[in-house]
Amino acid sequence: MKISSIDSIFAGWDGSITEARRLQSDMAERIVLKDDLNLLSEPTLLAGFDVGFEDEGRTTRAAAVLMNACDLKLLETHVVRVPTSMPYVPGLLSFRELPALLQALTQLSRIPALVFVDGHGIAHPRRLGIAAHFGLVTNLPCIGVAKKRLVGDFVEPGTAFGEHTPILLHGTQVGWALRSKIRCKPLMISPGHKISLHSALTWTQRCLNGYRLPEPTRQADRLASRRGQKIVSDLPSLL
C-alpha cells in the first residue's frame, strides 16, 4: 500500500514538546467521528498494528497484520524496524511510533477498510492519540484499543463478557470501557478517525475471539512483542 511521504508527516514541526502539543490540538479538530462510507457496506479487510522496541529502545519495531473481516482469517503479517525518532513523552506517543507504523502500513498488499491500532484514539488529553493520528494521516477508518486508561472517568463495567460503560472526559464521551473477557480488566476502546463511537465498540466486539484483545491487535501485539514469530514462519510467501 502506498502512502504519502513519511517525512512530510511531521513537516514544519520544530521537534519541541510545546509545538507537538499545539499540532495535536490543531489536528484533533480535523478528526471525523462519523462512519466512513466503506463501513456502511460490509468491509472485507481489517488491519491491526502494534509497536515494540529493541536495542534498549533505540529501534522501533512495528507489526502489521491483514485479515478477513468475515472470519478473522490471517492473510498477511509484516514487521519493520526503524530507528526510534524520539524518547517517550507522555501524551506524545504518536510522534514516537507513527514513523514505524506508517512504514509497516506500506508493506500491506491491499488497503484495509478498517484499522485497529494498539493505543488510544480520541481518549487522549488533546483528543489525538496514536490511533487518531494514524487515521488522520492515512485517511483510513481507525479504532484505538488500549489496555489501560489514559484520560477520563468511567464506571467499572459489569463482570459479564461484553459489558461496557462510557468513558467521559470533561463530560463528553470519548470511548468505552469494554469487558472483553471474563476475569480480565476492561479494554479502553475509542474511535480514531472516520468511525463513530458506536461502531468502534461494535467492531471491537465483532473481532473478539476468546481473548482479551480483538484479533487485529492481538495478532499484531504477538508480532510486535516477538511472541508471534511462528505466525511469520507460517506465512512465508507474504513477507
From Swiss-Prot:
Xref: HAMAP family: Endonuclease_5 (MF_00801)
Cofactor: Mg(2+)
Residues holding Mg(2+): 50, 118
GO biological process: DNA repair
One annotated GO molecular function: magnesium ion binding
Superkingdom, taxonomy of origin: Bacteria
Name of the protein this chain belongs to: Endonuclease V
GO CC field: cytoplasm
Entries under PANTHER family matching the protein: ENDONUCLEASE V
Family: Belongs to the endonuclease V family.
CDD domains: Endonuclease_V
Keywords: Cytoplasm, DNA damage, DNA repair, Endonuclease, Hydrolase, Magnesium, Metal-binding, Nuclease
Primary residence: cytoplasm
EC numbers: 3.1.21.7
Keyword DNA damage included in the entry's annotation: yes
Role according to the record: DNA repair enzyme involved in the repair of deaminated bases. Selectively cleaves double-stranded DNA at the second phosphodiester bond 3' to a deoxyinosine leaving behind the intact lesion on the nicked DNA.
Coiled-coil positions: none
Location of the protein in the cell: Cytoplasm
Annotated site residue numbers, Interaction with target DNA: 88
Gene3D superfamilies reported for this sequence: archaeoglobus fulgidus dsm 4304 superfamily
Reactions catalysed: Endonucleolytic cleavage at apurinic or apyrimidinic sites to products with a 5'-phosphate
